[in-house]
Amino acid sequence: LDLYGTIRAAVPTFDTYSHIGPQENFEKAIRKAAYFMERGGVFIFDLNTPYKHRHILAGQTFDIEAEDADCHWSNRYDETAQRVDITINIDYHETGEHFHEAFSEYSYALDTVCALLEKYGFAVAKVADGESFGPVRGDSPRWIITAVKQYTQEEKANGTES
């Protein structure tokens, strides 16, 4: 992420930050968002939870048959890497085309995410359950995290952040 100016808000969606890993890359993405964020700027993003990766996706295979295509979606959880490897294959009946995609999602503990946000000048304003928008539960599959930037990079460089 390199921008030509500052931003007042960033709202990555659709599990964007869940796809950033391992943790040093996740931290770098937060650092870059913070670098361009103005004081008072809002950072809102969703993140799949470790619960979802361990208990909903891990080891699961989904076969979906539709009129125009068949989809095979498989998930493999790697506890050591805190990562779900996802493979999706779609076969289109009419054209005979085959689509294949493989990607990973990474798990981060909520306290780790909050600590990284704070490290780069964000105050965590709210963490909500990503399905109900209510309080986070132990079985929440997704979090929506709202953080507010407390100072600019210039203020930090000058030692005037408060």
Placement of each model-derived feature along the sequence:
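Residues lining the SAM
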Residues: 13-15
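A short His-aromatic
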Residues: 18-20
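A short, glycine/Asx- and small/polar-enriched loop/turn
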Residues: 7, 82-84, 138-143
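A short glycine-rich, Lys/Arg-flanked "PGG" loop and its adjoining helix->strand segment in the class I
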Residues: 27-39
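SAM-dependent methyltransferase
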Residues: 24, 44-116
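A short acidic, Gly/Pro-enriched loop at the edge of an enzyme's catalytic core
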Residues: 2-10
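Short, hinge-like loop/turn segments at secondary-structure boundaries
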Residues: 10-11, 60-64, 143-144
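C-terminal lobe and adjacent flexible extensions of AdoMet/dcAdoMet transferase-like proteins
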Residues: 108-162
